């Protein structure tokens, strides 16, 4: 269904979150919903997660700038919960402007956003190299170390760039600490103070027109009737608190993070849309109970898993890493629904299951001989989970491009209906292909 064909209520706010380990297809859905939003907000993460959009057959990958930038007239916001690499930001702006997209007149960056500096990247990559086989799977872009500095109260913010003397003083203090770690513990080269200072201050004048009090601006435009769409990155099971720790990202990926990461009150969030693929994927290390295929693990290479990866084109949009694949895990989905307070689900990539003889759904686990119906909290316990499956007859008909529920194959509807039943909440949207209009709408998030 075309998003523009729906009338919605003004002044409503929707949060889009991934319910799995990221890569759920949030970018397409955010793009679809943006037809009814006047602003799109990033509230956590950095340029470590890519959102892939297919618009008019053209593929665009956005890593930092909100997906709404592809819609003329839509304001885009980077909140204080994001960690910002100016280098990555201006590279992305350059790519978009070269394609004719107006960016700098519509992009607003919180003055309180923490900066990613060269020493964060050096530490990130140095640590991962030192871990060897025990690596976490970081993208090496400095996101984690930047969040560490933020929590340790030594982070440098965007607003600090506009006070060069204070910035230089704090940068020198930070480098005294971080260069000791780099040279004495990680055994890599130190980061040069003057070069870093000159590079970072060179961004100040270019950033200044986009920097503002994002929290205040969001409050004002929403009060005036604008609909806001909060765009989560990564997924709930990668959340620093609620994910499969320590195999997680360094920020809170859950819906509640939209309030702290953008500076809005929780009562302003009207609807939480949870995005889930019709199967599961994971990139990098960490437990994965329903796993079928892992290119790096000979014991996890079932043919059906490779088929899901191949048909679903499961390669990271930023890293290019092959994703591990498995059946949809409803017990993990229930955990995500509870944590986020999900209002309704959007099921993506249903078409990847077309042609399978049978489809399985993990509805719980056996853990140390006990039945468990919810994903455990710790990685070691999750690693001991033995999936309990329900099996469904597959469908040979194609679901690609279907825009109405009743036109789905009967077996596909049966599978989706069971997912709703086990999840305990409705499926409000179904994606049947990569193009934005290949979408079934059952209940509109901006109208509920």
From Swiss-Prot:
Its EC number is 6.3.4.4. GTP binds at residues 22-28, 50-52, 323, 349-351, 431-433. It is found in: Cytoplasm. It comes from Paraburkholderia xenovorans (strain LB400). Belongs to the adenylosuccinate synthetase family. Substrate binds at residues 317-323. Pfam families: Adenylsucc_synt. This is Adenylosuccinate synthetase. The active site is at residues 23, 51. The gene is purA. Keywords: Cytoplasm, GTP-binding, Ligase, Magnesium, Metal-binding, Nucleotide-binding, Purine biosynthesis. Its cofactor is Mg(2+). Transmembrane segments: none annotated.
């Amino acid at each position: 269904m075309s998003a523009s064909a729906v009338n919605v209520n003004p002044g409503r706010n929707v949060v889009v979150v991934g319910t799995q380990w990221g890569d759920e297809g949030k970018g397409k859905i955010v793009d679809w919903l943006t037809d009814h939003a006047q602003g799109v907000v990033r509230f956590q993460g950095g340029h470590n997660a890519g959102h892939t959009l297919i618009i008019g057959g053209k593929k665009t990958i956005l890593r930092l700038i909100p997906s709404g930038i592809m819609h003329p007239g839509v304001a885009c916001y980077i909140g204080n919960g994001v960690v910002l690499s100016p280098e990555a930001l201006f590279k992305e702006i350059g790519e978009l402007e070269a394609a004719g997209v107006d960016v700098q007149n519509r992009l607003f960056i919180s003055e309180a956003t923490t900066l990613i500096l060269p020493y964060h990247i050096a530490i990130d990559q140095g640590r991962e190299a030192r871990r060897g086989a025990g690596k976490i799977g970081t993208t090496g872009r400095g996101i984690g170390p930047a969040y560490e500095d933020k929590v340790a109260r030594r982070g440098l913010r965007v607003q600090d760039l506009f006070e060069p003397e204070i910035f230089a003083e704090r940068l020198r203090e930070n480098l005294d600490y971080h260069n000791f770690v780099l040279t004495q513990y990680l055994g890599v080269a130190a980061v040069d103070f003057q070069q870093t200072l000159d590079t970072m201050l060179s961004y100040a004048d270019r950033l200044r027109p986009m920097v503002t009090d994002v929290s205040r601006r969001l409050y004002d435009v929403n009060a005036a009737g604008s609909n806001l769409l909060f765009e989560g990155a990564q997924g709930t099971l990668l959340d620093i608190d609620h994910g499969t720790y320590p195999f997680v990202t360094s920020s809170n990926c859950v819906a509640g993070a939209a309030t702290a990461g953008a500076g809005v009150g929780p009562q302003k969030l009207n609807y939480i849309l949870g995005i889930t693929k019709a199967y599961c994927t994971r990139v990098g290390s960490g437990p994965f109970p329903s796993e079928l295929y892992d290119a790096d693990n000979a014991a996890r290479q079932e043919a059906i898993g490779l088929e899901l990866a191949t048909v679903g084109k499961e390669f990271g949009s930023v890293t290019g890493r092959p994703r591990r694949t498995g059946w949809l895990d409803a017990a993990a989905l229930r955990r995500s629904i509870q944590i986020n307070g999900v209002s309704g689900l959007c099921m993506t990539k249903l078409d990847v299951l077309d042609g399978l003889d049978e489809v399985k759904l993990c509805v719980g686990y056996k853990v140390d001989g006990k039945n468990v119906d919810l994903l455990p909290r710790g990685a070691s316990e999750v690693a001991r989970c033995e999936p309990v499956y329900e099996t469904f007859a597959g469908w040979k008909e194609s679901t690609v491009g279907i825009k109405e529920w009743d036109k789905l194959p009967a077996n596909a509807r049966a599978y989706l209906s069971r997912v709703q039943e086990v999840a305990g909440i409705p499926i409000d949207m179904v994606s049947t292909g990569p193009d934005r209009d290949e979408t079934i709408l059952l209940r509109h998030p901006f109208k509920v």
